[in-house]
C-alpha cells in the first residue's frame, strides 16, 4: 500500500500475492485505517520485493499524507505513484495529515529521479513523467501565487478564495479544494508571509492576511 487508507483492495489482492502487503513504516494520521495490519513495514530506499527478475523499491513521498510512499520498478523505469501524483487531476493535500511544504518537496524529489512512466492510483499511466511532474509542481506554485493575490485583493477567507479560484470546478469538489487552500496557507504562515487575522491557529473558518 502507498498509504494505509480505508480501502478494500488489500483483501482482494492478498490471496494472489501470497498475502504480502507492505506499508510505510511511519504511522499516518488523518487518513489511516487503524484496522489494517501490513505483512511488514518498509522504509525509504528499501527493496520491498525482489523476485530475481524485478525489484520493487520504496520511495518515501510524504505530503499528500504524512506517510505516503511510491514504489519504483527499476527494470522498467516505472514508478507507482499512488495518490501523490494522479493521472486525471491534482492531488488533495488535507491538513493535518497532509502538508503542502512536504508535498512540494516530495514532488521535487521525484523530479530528481529518472522514471520514464508513472502509474498512479487514480487515472491512466503517465509516460512523460518528468514533464508531468514539472507541470504538477508549477500548478502548486501558481496556486500559491493566486492565493497571495486573493489576500492582496482583500479576499481573506478560504470560502472566498475557493469561490474565486475554483469557479470552474464542480461545487461538490469545493470542500476538498478548500482543504488544499488551507494547506497552502499553513505553508505560507510557516514562511512568515501570511498570518491568521485574529492570531489564532489556522483553520477553515479563519480569516487570513498578508504580513506587511
Give the location of each predicted region.
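Generic structural signal for secondary-structure transition and capping sites
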Residues: 47, 115-116, 156, 193
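Short hydrophobic/aromatic-enriched beta-strand-loop microsegments
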Residues: 1, 80-82, 173
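Hydrophobic residues at beta-strand termini and immediately following loops
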Residues: 42-43
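C-terminal regulatory/interaction regions
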Residues: 149-212
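Metallo-beta-lactamase
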Residues: 10-39, 48, 55-144
Amino acid at each position: 500500500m502507498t498509504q494505509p487508507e480505508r480501502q478494500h483492495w488489500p483483501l482482494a489482492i492478498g490471496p494472489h500475492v501470497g498475502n504480502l502487503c507492505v506499508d510505510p513504516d511511519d504511522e499516518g494520521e488523518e487518513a489511516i485505517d487503524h484496522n489494517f495490519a501490513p505483512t511488514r513495514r518498509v522504509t525509504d530506499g528499501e527493496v520491498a520485493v525482489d523476485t530475481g527478475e524485478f525489484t520493487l523499491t520504496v520511495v518515501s513521498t510524504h505530503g499528500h499524507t504524512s506517510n505516503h510512499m511510491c514504489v519504483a520498478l527499476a527494470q522498467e523505469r516505472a514508478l507507482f505513484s499512488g495518490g501523490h501524483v494522479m493521472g486525471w487531476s491534482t492531488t488533495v493535500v488535507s491538513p493535518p495529515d497532509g502538508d503542502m511544504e512536504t508535498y512540494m518537496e516530495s514532488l521535487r524529489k521525484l523530479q530528481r529521479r529518472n522514471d520514464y512512466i508513472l502509474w498512479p492510483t487514480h487515472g491512466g499511466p503517465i509516460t512523460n513523467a518528468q514533464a508531468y511532474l514539472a507541470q504538477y509542481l508549477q500548478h502548486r506554485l501558481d496556486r500559491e501565487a493566486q492565493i497571495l493575490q486573493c489576500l492582496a485583493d482583500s479576499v481573506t477567507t478560504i470560502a472566498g478564495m475557493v469561490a474565486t479560484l475554483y469557479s470552474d470546478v464542480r461545487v461538490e469538489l469545493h470542500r476538498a479544494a478548500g482543504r488544499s487552500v488551507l494547506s497552502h496557507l499553513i505553508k505560507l504562515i510557516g514562511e512568515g508571509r501570511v498570518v491568521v487575522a485574529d492570531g489564532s491557529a489556522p483553520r477553515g473558518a479563519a480569516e487570513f492576511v498578508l504580513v506587511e
